[in-house]
Amino acid sequence: MKKQLLLAGAALTLGLAGCSDDVTENLSNPIQTGEEIVFGSTINNGEYQKANGIQTKTIYAERIDHGIPVLWDPEGDEIAIVCPQALGNTKRADYLVKPDTTTTNWNQSGSVAKLDPSQTLKWGEEDAHKFFAFYPQNASILKDYAIEGENVNFTISLPATQNPTGWHTKTDENTQETTIYEIPNMDYALMWAYNKVYKSKLQGKSIDLDFKNFVTVLDITIPGPKNEHDAVTINNIVISPTDQSQQLTGDFKATIIPPSPTAHHDIASMKLSTPTPNEAHRQISISCVNKDNQGITLKHNEKLVIKAYLCPKIENYNLDTEKINLSFRISTNKETLTINHVPTHITNSKVNRILLPNIKP
């Protein structure tokens, strides 16, 4: 078995600014308490051209050397931003971000609009403001949040059934190898961000909110049969740890903790709770049936690529690598194939590639 670590290659960045009128070069325009906090945004992908007609960020398929590009969804991506220092009772606002479709690179936003016009984050009286952001703001995944002192607590629900939203096929012109990519549900690709800014120092400058991966992602490749005359139709894939005490998904609480005032950095930390015990969350099920209720047929010189989203390592939220033995049950039109004890070294909160052996007909 082979496994390759792939760092997630995109940091979602939001720029914030205060409302301001036109001013001359000799005048300053400090942000005033009560002004609305206005958002603009970018995804830091570097240069990335739209390829193969893919016009959505709900796909990881186009792998590049240094990571996986991410684009804004043309129909909009929903994010939540929390600011405990915001004026009044409104401490959270949800936004719809859309790309600038007039450009070739869709990492630039064309618009950032409030989902609820009544939600308005306003600059508070304090100079320092702390911003906590979440993607997605989907209520079925990001269930709730609470401000407790300097921290923000939230509850995450990561489902055991992780069906794709569609499929994308690409053929390599040189090798003629065809890859069938799952288009995953990006609601499972949870991210978070934190930053602290000072009103007195802002004055028109943008504020970066660099999103970090929250969940751990398995990028799984299943090669087709070795014999050129064989084919296998895959209907469903179930992933489970061989150690039944391990839980891959479920409901769990997390806390974003800003650095202490004496810290020599401004990097927030994360504290996680143990997921609520649930037998069903000890495995992940991924359907490979298309919209016509047909399974994915995998031939010789073809391969299938799917994603699975796991809870991050609970004991110590960091980028440590841990070893986990996984079992894969692949349901085909003929039988259920089981691949046991696949030793996998997983780096927490990153995209980890796993290559399985050729599927047998």
What spans do the regions from the language model cover?
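Sec-type signal peptide cleavage vicinity
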Residues: K3-A8, L16-P361
